C-alpha cells in the first residue's frame, strides 16, 4: 500500500508498515527541552527514579526563552536545567556561551537529521520538518517519558498535501505562504494532521523560508509540517556535522491524503495576519488602505529571526530612519546568525536606522521581556502568534508579517508595503 512521507518515517522507526490512524510506539531520535519546559520534565524524571537518560546524545536542552534571565523566578528555572545538564554531562546543552532559539539552533548544529522522529516540549518543534523529519511538540511529561525510555506513543497523523505553484513575486516568502494556508483552512483546519508542503514554488524558497513554513503548521492545528529533501535541503546540510546518517523519504505517487490544497503563489501579495488570530490574513495592500499606525516593530523569533530575514530588513533600512513614534527591536535567532550579521555590516545599518539589536532570545515573542507591549499599543511582528495579550497588555494588538513588511512599517510608522519604498 502506498504511503506518505510521514507514514514512511514512522514505518522505518517501528519496523513495519504503518498508516494514518494507527496507534504506535516509536523510537525517538531527538528530544528537545528549553529553560521553561525542561524543569517540569526533570522533576518527573527524578520522581520516576531514573538515574540516567535513555539516549544522552539524543537529548538537548536549549536555554532560550528567558536567557539571560530576566528575574529571580526565571533564574531559578534556569538553574534547574543547568544543574541537570552538568550532572548528566549533557553534550547538547546550550546556554549563554552558545545561545540561540532552539528551533534555529538545532538545525544549525546538525542535530536535526532528515528521517528523524523529533519531539520537543515546545509547540513550534514542527519547524524541524523543513529538513524532511517528523517533528512535533508535546508536553513536559511526554518529554520526561522519552528522556527515560527513548520512546513515545503516537497516533500516525493523516496528511494534508499543500501544493504551491508558480514563482513568488518580490517580497513574498515562506511566511506569506503559510499565512495564506492558515487563512484558507483556519486555525483548526489541520488539527492533528501532517501538513506536507510541496510543488514547484518550493524551488524558489530557501531553507529559511521553509523553516518559517513548517514553523507555523501548528497555527493551523497541525501535528507537524514537513518538506521532502531536495537539492536546497542538501545544500543546507552540506556543511553540517550531522548527528546521524540522513534518511531521505518521499511520498509515493497515489498515497492517501485527507485533503489536497493548491495555491498559486505568483498571485500572492505579502500577507498580514490581523489580531487576534493567525488565520485573520489580509493583503498588505488592504492593510495600507486601513492606515494602521504602529508603536513597535519586532523582527526575530524562531519564525523569522534568521540571517536572510536580517538581510531583508537591512536592505530596506539602509539609509533610512525608524519613524519617530515607532520603536524597532531586532533579535537574531542564534549567536552564529548575530555574528554573521555583524560581519556583513548589518548591525551598523540597524543601529544607524534607530533600531535596538538584542541577544538571541524568544523574549518579546511570548510577551516575556525585551519588547513587551503596553496598553493599546500596536506591533508589527515577524513572530507566529497574535492572540490576545500574546506580546503584552491584553488591549495591545499584534500584526504578523514577513521581515520586509516589518522593516518597511518601522520606517513608515504604520503598516507599509515594502514595494512602495
Where in the sequence are the language-model features?
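Fe-S-dependent hydro-lyases/dehydratases of central metabolism
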Residues: 1-421
